[in-house]
């Protein structure tokens, strides 16, 4: 990616973008503590993550969320009106179980534990944001954050996210997020920081 100009302007992510979106996010999350826990094999993690994010995009967030991308990053947001719909259906659960293999049960427990701590007030949820490491530091993630946060601000609503990567907390804090609590996932999983940003 060195000599190629990659636009960091957010655009709506459509179905045809699925391969690129999945690739960017798999590269972004390959060293993420939670993804390392769900996909412990260094050898198979990149390919499984690509399938995982591709499935989430095409079968869940792309249908009921607000998905944006740049030329090297992607973000999945869920506005309050999409919250009840942006849950995996039976076929999506089957596909995710296949991708996760023997970690599927742990994954289900972790998702349920995190969901139990989600705010009850109407809010926007930042489900995923990530940039290809080869393009980090070039404003891709920040541009996607600004775009989604502007939508939430226009609606006068707070934004909620969870992160398992301590290195990312300062970036989120820069954008106005505050840690609400630190969660310990069942089954010896990594710490998960629940963060909230008040509307501006």
Regions found by a protein language model. Name each.
Residues 42-65:
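Active-site rim helix/loop that mediates acceptor-substrate recognition in acyltransferases
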Residues 23-42, 56:
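Helix-loop element at the rim of GNAT/NAT acetyltransferase active sites that forms part
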Residues 68-132, 136, 186-190:
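Conserved acyl-donor/pantetheine-binding loop and adjacent beta-alpha core of acyl/acetyltransferases
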Residues 142, 154-155, 165-182, 188-189:
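Conserved active-site alpha-helix within GNAT-family acetyltransferase domains
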Residues 9-23, 27:
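A short beta-loop-alpha structural element at the N-terminal edge
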